[in-house]
Amino acid sequence: MKVVILGAGVIGVTSAWYLARAGHEVVVVDRQDGPALETSFANAGEISPGYASPWAAPGIPAKALRWLFMRHAPLIVRPGFDPAMVRWLVAMLGNCTARAYRVNKGRMVRLAEFSRDRLIELRQETGIRYDERSQGTLQLFRREKDLAGVAKDIEVLKADGVPFELLDAAGCIAAEPGLANSASPIAGGLRLPNDETGDCFKFTNALAELAKAEGVRFVLGRRIDAIVASGNRIAHVRTDRGDISGDAYLVALGSHSPLLLSPLGIRLPVYPVKGYSITVPIVDPARAPVSTLLDESFKVAITRLGDRIRVGGMAEISGYSNDLPPARRATLDHCVGSLFPDAGDLSQASFWTGLRPMTPDGTPVIGATGYRNLFLNTGHGTLGWTMACGSGHVIADIIGGKRPAIETGDLAIDRY
């Protein structure tokens, strides 16, 4: 079967890999000149199944109101009349209940843990390298009142069987020795030892090369203008340089997926939630993080990637804007500078933004559509890197008519 994949980010490329390994002819189409040049380019670098949680949770509406007035706010909303934004926000608020949170988190953890296992398997099989580390994630609490609220998180971790360590300040410094130099107080932390880190851009490009060796063809620098249907099937994809046809089609275009699906009558509830990152060259390795640290106060991740520190996070709801406000950069500088002072040269840091494809319930949309040969693998939000290998594996099974190794029925678009 010839499968045409739209999107060469980490989701599209992992899907291509598993489809090719299953014996399919695969073509990947993307408007960029290389893989992983949009949302997969400079994300936070964490692979954290244990922290796979929906943003829609009990108490979030009240927290969001407080965040809007903070100087270094983890959430920014730029209001405007965008019906898609309004629908998305209303649907997200509808998921901020205890029952919905449990259901959605269960789906996310299931896929994230399956994905981590597939990543380990892929690494062992191919020897792929991407500045990877397997040294866990530390969720750091600067304030005692935030640490006191971790009991609910621990209950969820216990229920899901996720290993964890509750640490005091000394324990946090033992896990991340660079914190001994912190200019900020440390109340304690929650460490998940089974989490990993790695450079998503390096991984995606390395896997693309391996996929080419399996026969995958990349058609890059092509703007995708439309998905053209004939009856209940997709006939071809229209690009700015001609049509591309196949037997099956997979949409893995992240936040841009709804724009191409809407003319087909498919309302995909995915909306872009903007994130920011800086990548800082390390000047003192002893002061730098060892793995990934999640700064609970600012909702920012600080990750060691080889000789660099990646600092990423925040959430801005502002449509498809790609501007880079200095205030967002200042927040990232403050986070890493206060916890790991003099570890990196902030004057040489690169500043980046990406549009995360978020669903109202936090769970990606993976599976078939009402068109017999059109499939979706999108809407992973902040967890595209964490869920990539698992998502690629299950969609390859679904397209190939095989039963996936995990339950995927509740990931399909018909849940909406």
From Swiss-Prot:
Q: Which UniProt keywords apply?
A: FAD, Flavoprotein, Oxidoreductase
| One Gene Ontology molecular-function label | D-amino-acid dehydrogenase activity
Question: So, what pathway does this thing act in?
Answer: Amino-acid degradation; D-alanine degradation; NH(3) and pyruvate from D-alanine: step 1/1
Mind telling me what this protein is named? D-amino acid dehydrogenase
Question: Could you say which enzyme class this protein belongs to?
Answer: oxidoreductase
The record's annotation in InterPro entries points to: DadA (IPR023080), FAD-dep_OxRdtase (IPR006076), FAD/NAD-bd_sf (IPR036188)
Its recorded reaction(s) are: a D-alpha-amino acid + A + H2O = a 2-oxocarboxylate + AH2 + NH4(+)
Keyword Oxidoreductase in annotation: yes
Job description of the protein: Oxidative deamination of D-amino acids.
Looking up SUPFAM superfamilies in the UniProt record yields: FAD-linked reductases, C-terminal domain, FAD/NAD(P)-binding domain
What family name appears in the similarity comment?
Belongs to the DadA oxidoreductase family.
- Record gene name: dadA
Query: What EC number(s) does this enzyme carry?
Result: 1.4.99.-
Q: Name one GO cellular component term.
A: cytoplasm
**Biological process per Gene Ontology, one example term:** D-alanine catabolic process
